[in-house]
């Protein structure tokens, strides 16, 4: 079996018709899934980026069924607002934008899950675990990670696979 199920927001509203379709699809899935199964949400950018509205997000948070959102808003005020909306619920916000990774963590996001965790997860892990205790170093690291993320558009995922092949963690760079 599975430990949890992550629902992709653009699949809950495939034609981007709005909240009515989103909620209808979500309700049918929730009725069919075991109530004990932890659920997540991912605002996957493909085939289109379907960000949750505040009402949709709050409903999911307050339902008690959802434990994680992979936020792809790329907008710190949105992450901050969602963290506030989720307070007191099981729902945790995980940011996926490297440019705001550290500020989002400081705002209460429960970590980072963007493309660059495929390159150097240990650096993001350190930032999450130790950053608040070593602010000067964390601030410098955050700048480095943000600047490094510019290379995301230079051939990902192939560039990550080449990197791991050179580290010896992958046998091939085939995509």
Please name every model-derived segment.
Residues 37-38, 90, 171:
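Secondary-structure boundary/capping signal
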Residues 1, 90-93, 156, 165:
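Helix-coil boundary/capping segments in enzymes
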